[in-house]
Amino acid sequence: MTDLSLDFKKQGGLLPVIVTDFQTGQVLMLAYMNEEAYQKTLDSKEMYYWSRSRNELWHKGDTSGHYQYVKSIKTDCDQDTLLIAVEQVGAACHTGAYSCFFNEIYNPE
């Protein structure tokens, strides 16, 4: 594991987090973490986020039972975005869909 300094300052104290299924690579969701959510995620190996709409820490699965267990964490070249692969229990999306990315805008086929 490499010790990198994540840049929480660039985007107002939050990092975008792209979450993928660790087995398939499917993108499940995009959310945000503040430093507290990031530390809790590292410590517990379960996903914590910062809810921008509720302005509070959010432990994924506490309400729905659809927990996310961390399998790997990567950062981009600027250390201001995270890519986290998880074991997803149930649906990742609040709509009940496995992935939040199900609305197709363009597909040439």
UniProtKB/Swiss-Prot annotation:
Keywords: Amino-acid biosynthesis, Cytoplasm, Histidine biosynthesis, Hydrolase, Magnesium, Metal-binding, Zinc. It is found in: Cytoplasm. InterPro entries: PRA-CH, PRib_AMP_CycHydrolase_dom, PRib_AMP_CycHydrolase_sf. It is an enzyme of class 3 (hydrolase). Its cofactor is Mg(2+); Zn(2+). Pathway: Amino-acid biosynthesis; L-histidine biosynthesis; L-histidine from 5-phospho-alpha-D-ribose 1-diphosphate: step 3/9. It comes from the Bacteria. The keyword GTP-binding does not apply. GO terms for cellular component: cytoplasm. One of its GO terms (molecular function) is magnesium ion binding. Its EC number is 3.5.4.19. Mg(2+) binds at residues 76, 78, 80. Binds 1 Mg(2+) ion per subunit. Binds 1 zinc ion per subunit. One of its GO terms (biological process) is L-histidine biosynthetic process. Zn(2+) binds at residues 77, 93, 100. It holds the Pfam family PRA-CH. It catalyses: 1-(5-phospho-beta-D-ribosyl)-5'-AMP + H2O = 1-(5-phospho-beta-D-ribosyl)-5-[(5-phospho-beta-D-ribosylamino)methylideneamino]imidazole-4-carboxamide. Catalyzes the hydrolysis of the adenine ring of phosphoribosyl-AMP. Belongs to the PRA-CH family. Homodimer. This is Phosphoribosyl-AMP cyclohydrolase. The gene is hisI.
